[in-house]
Amino acid sequence: MASTEGANNMPKQVEVRMHDSHLSSEEPKHRNLGMRMCDKLGKNLLLSLTVFGVILGAVCGGLLRLAAPIHPDVVMLIAFPGDILMRMLKMLILPLIISSLITGLSGLDAKASGRLGTRAMVYYMSTTIIAAVLGVILVLAIHPGNPKLKKQLGPGKKNDEVSSLDAFLDLIRNLFPENLVQACFQQIQTVTKKVLVAPPSEEANTTKAVISLLNETMNEAPEETKIVIKKGLEFKDGMNVLGLIGFFIAFGIAMGKMGEQAKLMVEFFNILNEIVMKLVIMIMWYSPLGIACLICGKIIAIKDLEVVARQLGMYMITVIVGLIIHGGIFLPLIYFVVTRKNPFSFFAGIFQAWITALGTASSAGTLPVTFRCLEDNLGIDKRVTRFVLPVGATINMDGTALYEAVAAIFIAQMNGVILDGGQIVTVSLTATLASIGAASIPSAGLVTMLLILTAVGLPTEDISLLVAVDWLLDRMRTSVNVVGDSFGAGIVYHLSKSELDTIDSQHRMHEDIEMTKTQSVYDDTKNHRESNSNQCVYAAHNSVVIDECKVTLAANGKSADCSVEEEPWKREK
């Protein structure tokens, strides 16, 4: 017994055979620094090319500005590859949003998707409010606006005032599109028109009255006529992203509740998502050239760059400093506090998405690249990214909120208007709410700025004075928006990881049960066939209804082979 126990306690030896491909040679410890740099560049070739494209575009644009005036056709040809890149990225937005939302939500139950959405919304609202407050603090501290600056820039263009109520109602209307196909390329907007209304005429001849009214209108409106503002709804060009997201969120949740019945549909959208991501990879290899051409063409097209830099330099510095503080300090700090992980290694994983946003100035256009960075580089669960990122690209606009808060108070300072505490709070809240609905409003930047200025009673015509530097600030705030979306996905994934693991274990348990049932049915069928293999069923003309058997005839002792395909039996002679 002792010897047996000793034998049992002996360590078991396991032989592991490895192929040569599994073995890697140990790198020498003392390697040339240049060789190590080349290795890193080779592993991150696409990222290196993208960064090189941004630098090349900026340098070439600056050098070409020093040359003789360039013909507009030449500028158009320089920017043409960038225009193609933007078209390709925007082409993938619709199928990517549809497939990602449906596949992400179909893998979650109703409770999990609700908690996921709640965490995402809390993060979005918190960071957007922080960004708006930060912008207000910086613009009040730096005070870039000066009444003398207004005289240098000259008068702006008159803009129609926009009602906050109309904008809010348009937001709700676009959330529930009446035609899903139309929502792919149009969205609804309230339009105000000024109409001259004549007083009731006592003349019997209506035609003469109308002609008289038209003649008076051509010259000068008489005192009796009144100007009446009439409102109406019109469809404007532009994808109704908010409406599409709302519908497909509901579609994905409903499909997830159907379980096995919707399995085929889930597989279809999973395949669609994989196809779109394959196309994204192909487009990303073209992006370095496209981004370089975009930046180069935009720099060349700017008029009076030096004059604009002198006049609006402090305004630009205020916005850029705010974006750097928010994107480089506040967002990483929030991520570290919640997850206790290194935010800079996280940022390294999304650097490709950040540089793409900097070049394209489009959160939605960068969405395919952001998906790839988070899922492939950082290993975030696809159920989180496919739900959080499309929603975040639509409503989470930290950079936009900061920019609009700074711009509104800058215009007030430029006009010599001193805002009280209530008006400053109004600017902060309006900037937050306007940035949330920016994606579903046509001409979003202009309209949302009009909302803020109208809310605090500032002149709306001064917005046109800021357009000269918007090309740069737009890229900066878009890159911060993408960084905010990415950190949000990482935070939501960290908070939801235990729930996702529980759902995975439930799915595995369900699959094991289904596999056991299938195996049981298979075993029963096999046993049934084996029990019937020794039996022969005689019918007319010696036909049988079994697969195959070999029997001995009692009449003459000869054997016979029988099968379903062969009847009557072939008797052996």
UniProtKB/Swiss-Prot annotation:
A Pfam family of this chain: SDF
Effect of residue 298 to N/T: Reduced transporter activity
Reaction equation(s) it catalyzes: K(+)(in) + L-glutamate(out) + 3 Na(+)(out) + H(+)(out) = K(+)(out) + L-glutamate(in) + 3 Na(+)(in) + H(+)(in); D-aspartate(out) + K(+)(in) + 3 Na(+)(out) + H(+)(out) = D-aspartate(in) + K(+)(out) + 3 Na(+)(in) + H(+)(in); K(+)(in) + L-aspartate(out) + 3 Na(+)(out) + H(+)(out) = K(+)(out) + L-aspartate(in) + 3 Na(+)(in) + H(+)(in)
UniProt-annotated binding residues for Na(+) 1: 392, 396, 481, 485
Tissue-specificity statement: Localized in brain and is highly enriched in the Purkinje cell layer in cerebellum.
Range of residues in the leader sequence: none
Main location: membrane
Ranges of Polar residues composition bias in the record: 1-11
Residue ranges annotated as Cytoplasmic topological domain: 1-44
Subcellular location: Cell membrane
PANTHER family: EXCITATORY AMINO ACID TRANSPORTER 2, SODIUM/DICARBOXYLATE SYMPORTER-RELATED
General function of this protein: Sodium-dependent, high-affinity amino acid transporter that mediates the uptake of L-glutamate and also L-aspartate and D-aspartate. Functions as a symporter that transports one amino acid molecule together with two or three Na(+) ions and one proton, in parallel with the counter-transport of one K(+) ion. Mediates Cl(-) flux that is not coupled to amino acid transport; this avoids the accumulation of negative charges due to aspartate and Na(+) symport. Essential for the rapid removal of released glutamate from the synaptic cleft, and for terminating the postsynaptic action of glutamate.
Name of the protein in its database record: Excitatory amino acid transporter 2
Species whose genome carries this gene: Rattus norvegicus
Lineage: Eukaryota, Metazoa, Chordata, Craniata, Vertebrata
Gene field: Slc1a2
